[in-house]
Regions:
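Residue signature of alpha-solenoid helical repeat architecture, marking inter-repeat boundaries
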Residues: 33, 73, 113-115
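Amphipathic alpha-helical segments of tetratricopeptide repeats
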Residues: 25-29, 61-67, 100-108, 142-149
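Residue register of alpha-helical TPR repeats
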Residues: 2, 37, 77, 117-119
Length: 149
């Protein structure tokens, strides 16, 4: 049996964000939610609506929850997601700081995971490009490409 959350993710991935949100929002409370998948989905749904304040609050909670559980996998995901929110708003310096924080976790806890490294380096390259640091951006983009092959 497929859960409401799985169905909502499927709807989101099909671009049906309002349908996805209707399916899960009544069960969602930022204050009590401890489900990383639901937090992540609600964050994406609110980002699609450009509700940056709520989205930021969700991913700050996501990071705090991961830290409380010493869950480095979800901590690095939360940092990456929060960086995407700041990037979407044009706050590239704050986005870069969060991506660099994520990089430290990936390097220390996932040193052999080239996918995590490639995704992080792509984001570093993209944000540095947006900051007009073109040489640095190219270095990170090339590194991302190498790691993804």
């Amino acid at each position: 049996m497929v859960s409401k959350l799985d169905t909502a993710w499927d709807l989101f991935l099909e671009g049906k964000t309002s349908e996805a949100k209707k399916l899960v929002e009544q069960d969602f409370s930022i204050d009590t939610c401890t489900d990383f998948s639901l937090l992540n989905l609600m964050g994406y749904l609110l980002l699609a609506e450009k509700d940056y304040a709520s989205c930021t609050h969700i991913f700050e909670k996501y990071i705090l929850l991961a830290q409380q559980n010493e869950d480095k996998e979800n901590e690095h995901i939360g940092l990456h997601q929060l960086a995407m929110i700041y990037r979407d708003q044009g706050d590239f310096h704050k986005a870069l700081k969060l991506i660099e924080d994520e990089e430290k976790i990936v390097e220390e806890y996932f040193p052999n995971d080239n996918l995590k490294k490639a995704v992080n380096n792509y984001e570093q390259g993209y944000v540095r490009f947006k900051l007009n640091n073109l040489d640095e951006a190219l270095t990170f983009m090339n590194l991302s490409l190498e790691q993804s092959l």
